From Swiss-Prot:
Glycosylation sites recorded in the entry for this protein: N210, N427, N432
Protein role: Negative regulator of T-cell proliferation.
The keyword Transferase belongs to this UniProt entry's keyword annotation: no
Subcellular location: Membrane
Gene: Btnl2
Membrane topology: Single-pass type II membrane protein
Main location: membrane
Protein known as: Butyrophilin-like protein 2
Transmembrane region(s): 7-23
């Protein structure tokens, strides 16, 4: 190492490096976002801001607002104007550049008609040349749901069920029950459904086994909304209504229906009661959304599940006897399962449950013969269009079961099954075999393949 009087080369290099590291970049600046989250209710406008320090104009800089990917901006502002056509899908037509404070280094993005999907983190990136800095901005979106509704189901064998329902919440809320003295009560079940609009519906069930319980309250709340929504019910009063002593009767057996046919779900009040003034709801697993609603003598379409829109109708010829039939047209495989039929009035409901079994009988099996490389022979049996998953069976001419070499089931876009099964033929003396494909309800299709002369 070469040394100069009073200096060392390593010391000079270290000093030079220190100067480089501490030298102020000609474009040096930083970006600062708000210290606290920005709060906005669904449907309102939100204003996201960030500041350039030290203060200077951003008119000739690039300002990029984005969520997680800088290449997919919410908005891009460059050289004094918005760059069109680059906004993320879902923000197009809803974002606006605010120019009021560009001279002071403050920039703002307005999001109009805030939606639940707007909730979360945003980044504000400011760039000049190749130099950029960014800061994060947190937007917290909230929606206050509808006032809770408590209705009574039963009484049943385990007691009276109280169901607390509400819609239109964001983010996902919490639910709790209290007795008349403020004591917490344990829910039997709690279901939160995320709707097409991005909002949550709540269905919380409480079982009351103590006849002395009089008043019960349901509370629903979420973050950012300090006061919970509340509903209270006086139980003895509800249990004295006429409907509380009635019951709903539905089919005792599952209803079989083929794909494309019409499903008919019939429910009736017992004893017979005129149901014209009642609310009648057909549900799947939860209270919201519904398969079909009849209330105040009319059909309510607003609560209906998307997959049932335009496919349901109601037969009301015997409504004065408390009997109604829901028709679901053009049955699909997704319609299979359990349905709940509820009659209600003044917050008291009685229900029956109905099972639907959807089936589709597939095509006639096709059997083809294939010669293997080792000289052996296999038979391939194929068919499609089955639901639910069918049973496949090979048999010889005497009806004895033959073990298949392999079976494969595939579901297409309509959830119908395609079937393929292979049979290795080891005995050339067999005259013929059959391939049978059947459903649990007894529907069956069979194909026969002759093997004589091999």
């Amino acid at each position: 190492m070469v040394d100069f009087p009073g200096y060392s080369l390593s010391g000079v290099a270290a000093s030079f490096l220190f100067v480089l590291l501490t030298m102020k970049h000609p474009d040096d600046f930083r970006v600062v976002g708000p210290a606290l989250p920005i709060l906005a209710n669904v449907g309102e406008d939100a204003l996201l801001t960030c500041r350039l320090l030290p203060k200077r104009t951003t008119a000739r800089m690039e300002v990029r607002w984005y969520r997680s990917d800088p290449d997919t901006p919410v908005m891009l502002y460059r050289d004094g104007a918005e760059v069109p056509g680059l906004a993320m899908e879902g923000y197009r037509g809803r974002v606006e550049w605010m120019e009021d404070s560009t001279e002071e280094g403050s920039v703002a993005l307005k999001i109009r008609q805030v939606q639940p999907g707007d909730d979360g983190q945003y980044w504000c990136r400011i760039q000049e040349g190749d130099y950029w800095r960014e800061a994060s901005v947190l937007l917290q979106v909230a929606a206050l749901g509808s006032s809770p509704n408590i209705h009574v189901e039963g009484p049943g064998e385990e007691g009276v069920q109280l169901v607390c329902t509400s819609r239109g919440w964001f983010p996902e809320p919490e639910v709790y029950w209290e007795g008349i003295r403020g004591e917490k009560l344990m829910s039997l079940s709690e279901n939160h459904v995320y709707g097409e609009d991005g909002l949550f519906s709540v269905e919380d069930t409480l079982v009351v086994r103590n006849d002395s319980v009089e008043t019960i309250s349901c509370f629903i709340y979420n973050r950012g909304l300090r006061e919970p929504q509340e509903a209270t019910i006086a139980l003895p009063e509800k249990l004295q209504t006429e409907l509380a002593s009635s019951r709903v009767i539905g089919p005792s057996q599952a209803i079989p229906v083929r794909v494309g046919e019409t499903i008919e779900l019939t429910c009736q009040l017992s004893p017979q009661t005129d149901a014209q003034s009642l609310e009648v709801r057909w549900l799947r697993a939860r209270y919201y959304p519904v398969v079909h609603v009849y209330t105040n003598g009319a059909h309510e379409a607003g609560e209906q599940m998307a997959e049932y829109r335009g496919r349901t109708s109601l037969v009301t010829d015997a409504i004065h006897e408390g009997k109604l039939t829901l028709q679901i047209h053009n049955a699909r495989t997704s319609d299979e399962g359990q349905y709940r039929c509820l009659f209600g009035k003044d917050g008291v409901y009685q229900e029956a449950r109905v099972d639907v079994q959807v089936m589709a009988v597939g095509s006639t099996p096709q059997i083809t013969r294939e010669v293997l490389k080792d000289g052996g022979t296999q038979l391939r049996c194929t068919s499609d269009g089955w639901f639910p998953r069918p049973h496949v069976q090979w048999r010889d001419r005497d009806g004895r079961t033959l073990p298949s070499f392999s079976e494969a089931f595939r579901q297409g876009s309509q959830e119908l099954f395609q079937v393929e099964t292979l049979l290795l033929v080891t005995n050339g003396s067999m005259v013929n075999v059959t391939c049978s494909i059947s459903l649990p309800l007894g529907e069956e299709k069979t194909a026969r393949f002759p093997l004589s002369g091999w």
